[in-house]
A protein has these predicted regions:
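Boundary/linker segments of alpha-helical solenoid repeat arrays
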Residues: 98-99, 126-140
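N-terminal alpha-helical interaction modules that lie
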Residues: 1-80, 142-226
Length: 226
């Protein structure tokens, strides 16, 4: 991502990527949003006052705890409504969390609300695609750029990649090893690089990072749609 371009485009009220307008379209479930729209939406969030990646998200913790009580094979209407409310609260602080969007897609689908199911499925896939478009994750210089630590883990979970403990390779990049190497078109991959520079900016010297959980609980996987 070119930071100067992102700042210029998202702060200019005459730009098609003016941030308040992009966020309104995203929140309304606009299905006409393009890859470019999502690029400026996701990375432009780093320059919004609401972006506070180091703040604790107690609503996220609450949503995960509630999700762990849901019987995903035979959920009740009450448990799904409770889950949706909790996830929406958590999205206020982390509006692009793939795991939260995945939970919403599941919950709405289980309730028979196909419209909101598809909206959140599209949001999740678009966010994941935006991150993957920022690099290939195979080298420090082509690391995937993310806004929250959890987004990195969710991306790996979405591809069913089981990972080990991350290690720092530079001031802004970490390497996440895979427990089992995978073979792809790029060859044999042992792990991926993630750029956390947006998170590290203005980090207090005494701040201690806490790693988030990913969505791998109760065997809930990213849903697949035709």
């Amino acid at each position: 991502p070119v930071e100067e371009d992102i700042i210029r485009q998202t702060l200019d009220s005459e730009s098609p990527y003016y941030y308040p307008n992009l966020m309104l379209r995203y929140q309304s479930g606009d299905d006409s949003m393009t890859e470019e729209d999502y690029h400026y939406l996701y990375y432009g969030y780093a320059y919004q006052d609401a972006y506070k990646p180091l703040n604790a998200n107690s609503d996220m913790d609450k949503a995960i705890l509630i999700a762990q009580t849901v019987d995903f094979e035979n959920p009740t209407h009450e448990s799904l409504e409770k889950l949706i409310a909790a996830v929406n609260d958590a999205l206020v602080q982390d509006p692009f969390s793939p795991k939260l969007l995945n939970l919403l897609a599941f919950a709405y689908g289980a309730l028979g609300d196909s419209k909101n199911e598809q909206i959140n499925y599209n949001r999740m896939n678009s966010i994941l695609a935006t991150i993957e478009d920022s690099g290939n994750g195979l080298k420090e210089g082509s690391a995937w750029h993310i806004l929250m630590f959890g987004h990195a883990l969710d991306l790996l979970a979405a591809h069913d990649r089981h990972y080990g403990k991350a290690r720092v390779v530079s001031r802004s990049v970490e390497y996440v090893p895979l427990l089992e190497p995978v073979r792809t078109e790029e060859g044999r991959i042992k792990g991926y690089y993630f750029d956390y520079s947006r998170i590290y900016r203005n980090k207090p010297d005494d701040y201690v990072f806490k790693r988030p959980r990913t969505w791998q609980f109760n065997n809930l996987r990213p849903r697949e749609y035709k």
